[in-house]
């Protein structure tokens, strides 16, 4: 692996069952081609997008009394305003499998800093990337440059936003209702409010 990829700027980490390679988006096409052609990673098993916004932060940071359900004594996480750039926020993980060598490999690449965030499409290398990339586009808003048919695949065409982003409101932007006067289904702003959905667990610092 190191011999084939020695000319690229990569970071390699290993555990008992998997190898992970972190690369720059500019090298994605060349590295992916080398992995398939020279190292027999014939199959792309999955494409996973991750949003690192507020990574490591938690809502439950309080020693106050608890008495009002899940919303008790909680200070909600503050989501920053969306900037024009996304430095270090979105990453894409490609899960590869070499059947002939019985080896798994994870390829990790952070997206461009542009808005929308983007990486090159790997459809021309592994055809299975087609719907995986469409899913990541639909749910995370990541653009895959060169994809032949990049459109939503899980949400409907009237959907606003990308629901797996951490700054997407948990109650959504729109709801679908039946309008009795128009006698048709219509979109309208959501009519519910949000609150923390995870109970607080109190632990003794000495445990």
For each predicted feature, which ranges?
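Terminal low-complexity/charged segments
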Residues: 1-207
